[in-house]
Amino acid sequence: SDFARLLAIQVVDWLHDLEKSEIGFELFSLVEIGPGEGTLSRDLILAVGEIAPALISKIEIVLVELNAGMRERQEKVVNKLEGVNYRWSNIDDLISSPVTGVIVANEVLDAFPVERLVFTQNKVFRQGVSLRRKNDDYYLEFVDLMPTSLIMNFLNDSNSLLKIEFPPKDICNRWVTEWHCDLPNWFKKLSNVLSNGSLLVVDYAMESKRYYSANRKDGTLISYRNQEANSNLLKDAGLCDLTAHLCIESTINYALTNGWSFMGETRQGQALLALGLSGFLYSLQNTDINNLSAALNRRESLLRLVDPMGLGDFRWLAFQKSNNDDLILGKRFLEEPTS
C-alpha cells in the first residue's frame, strides 16, 4: 500500500539512525501492536526492502497479537514473505527479552477501555452499565457510580500538571467525557519492551481544549457495526466495536512519565506529505493510457490518506526510548512537505 511505502521512508530513517549509533543488537525489530490482517507489516517490510535492501537481513518482524483467530489470518499473509525474519510474540515475553527497533501502533489505542465520567450538579460520577429486567425482557441501562480514587487522581493531575479544567465552564447537566485509564501502564510496559528505538502511535486524537470542550457533551466514545457509526452505545451490545479518541496532552504526559521522550506529533496528512506523497501523485501523470483506471483508483486512495475530513486528520505521535545518550532519531515526518 502507498501508506506503508510512505511510512517505510520514516522507518528506514530510524533504522539507519540506530545502525549509525553502533548500539549492540542481533536483529532490528519492527514490532506491530495489533496487526489486524497482517497487511501493514507485510507491506512495510516489502517497502523497506525496496528502499534499503541491505537492511532486510538485519530486521525481524514481530507481530503482537493476542487473538488466536486473527493470528491465523496474519499467518496466511506473512507466511508468503520470502527471506524475511518474522515471529509472533506478546508484550510480557518481549519485556523478558527487550528489542531494538521501531514499534508501530496503528489504530490500536482508540479501542482501549475507557472510564466514562459524568458531571452533574458539581459532582462527578463513574458511568456504569446495569442489566435490568422488565417483565420477561432484559435490557441494559447506564447508572451513576461513585468515582474511584484513580479517577479522582486523573482529574486532579490533569488540572495541576496539564492545566485541564474539570469540568469546563458552561457545561450542560450530565456532561460526559472519557479517561483512557489503561494508557499509563501500556506506555510503561512498552518502555520495558524497547531498549533503544522509536514508538509511533497513529490514531484518532485531539487537543485537550477540543476534547474537554463544553460543547462536546457526549464525549468521543462511539459504537461501530458493519462500518456504521452509532451514538447509542448500548445498542447491539457485544456485537459492536467501541472507539474513543485520545487526548493528545494526556497521552504525551503518560508517555513522558513512563520512560519515553517525546519526538513530536502532527496530522497524518502533513506527515505523509512530508514523506513524499505529492511525489507519488506526480508520478501518476505519466501513466500509460491502458493503466488509467488503476492510476485513478490509486490517486483516489492517496487523496483519501490526506483528506482533512477523514484519514488525514489522524494524528501521528512519535516517542523515543534510549539507553544511549548519543542516540538521535530523525523526524522527517515533521519536516516541511516535499514537493
Specify the residue positions occupied by each region the protein language model found.
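Beta-sheet entry/capping signal
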Residues: S29, E60, R87-W88, T100-V102, ...
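A mobile, often basic/glycine-rich helix-loop segment
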Residues: V102-N156, A214-Y224
